Structures are given as C-alpha cells and as structure tokens.
Amino acid sequence: MENKKTIYFLCTGNSCRSQMAEAWGKQYLGDKWNVYSAGIEAHGVNPNAIKAMNEVNIDITNQTSDMIDINILNNADLVVTLCSHADSVCPSTPPHVNRVHWGFDDPAGKEWSEFQRVRDEIRERIKRFSEIGE
C-alpha cells in the first residue's frame, strides 16, 4: 500500500531547474514522496542540465519535459514553483494544496558554472526540505 505524498516542481519550460529538482527530489525524497516536474511550456530537457546532473552521477536522460498536468497539480500535497514566472502564471491550486516558492536563477544560455551553481543550490534546498520539512 502506497501512502506517499506528491511533490510537484514547476518552472517556465521544464527544461533546467525543475528537471534538476525532480532528480534531486527522487534522490532525497523518493522514499516518502512521488516526485514530478512540469512547466508552463515544455522546452525539452536542456543538454547542460543533463550534463550537470551526470557530473554528480545522476542520469536524467529518461526524464521528459512536460506541461503542467492539472490532475497532478490538483492532487499534489506540495507544489513548488522554482521561478517567479511560474509562480505568477501557474494555474491556481485548490485550497488543500500547499504551494511554496523557492526561487532559483535560470542557467539556460549562461556559462557552464551557472548550471553547476544552480544544480548545487537546488540540491541544498531539497536536502534541507528532506531533513527539516520546510
């Protein structure tokens, strides 16, 4: 019997930040949470996001870039927006769905070191959530 909660990471294109968050979420929260990610649009998984996660031995090549699924959104226990655009244009969530904003810079189109920095910041934030629940 599965009593896992559902966490849903959202950003604009489901390309970089939410993909990395989904991967870290599965690593740190997978025992207790079903972990999903999506975007306002689906831009495809950024090759540098794949490369950044490979650098820490996490393979996200099988993750897909998806638009927001209203069923997952409406049934999630926690929705986490990762960029201000997703926070402002995300469809409304029902009152029983806890929604929080964890803002991270968009590394797309920037230096490689930005992908590494954002990857590590997302890891630390999700690790903290796994340890203290906030």
Curated annotation (Swiss-Prot):
It catalyses: arsenate + [thioredoxin]-dithiol + H(+) = arsenite + [thioredoxin]-disulfide + H2O. CDD domains: LMWP_ArsC. It is found in: Cytoplasm. One of its GO terms (molecular function) is protein tyrosine phosphatase activity. Its EC number is 1.20.4.4. GO terms for cellular component: cytoplasm. Disulfide bonds join C11-C83, C83-C90. It is an enzyme of class 1 (oxidoreductase). Its main location: cytoplasm. GO terms for biological process: response to arsenic-containing substance. InterPro entries: Arsenate_reductase_ArsC, Ptyr_pPase, Ptyr_pPase_sf. The active site is at C11, C83, C90. Keywords: Arsenical resistance, Cytoplasm, Disulfide bond, Oxidoreductase, Redox-active center. Pfam families: LMWPc (PF01451). HAMAP family: Arsenate_reduct (MF_01624). Belongs to the low molecular weight phosphotyrosine protein phosphatase family. Thioredoxin-coupled ArsC subfamily. Catalyzes the reduction of arsenate [As(V)] to arsenite [As(III)]. This is Arsenate reductase. It comes from Bacillus cereus (strain 03BB102).
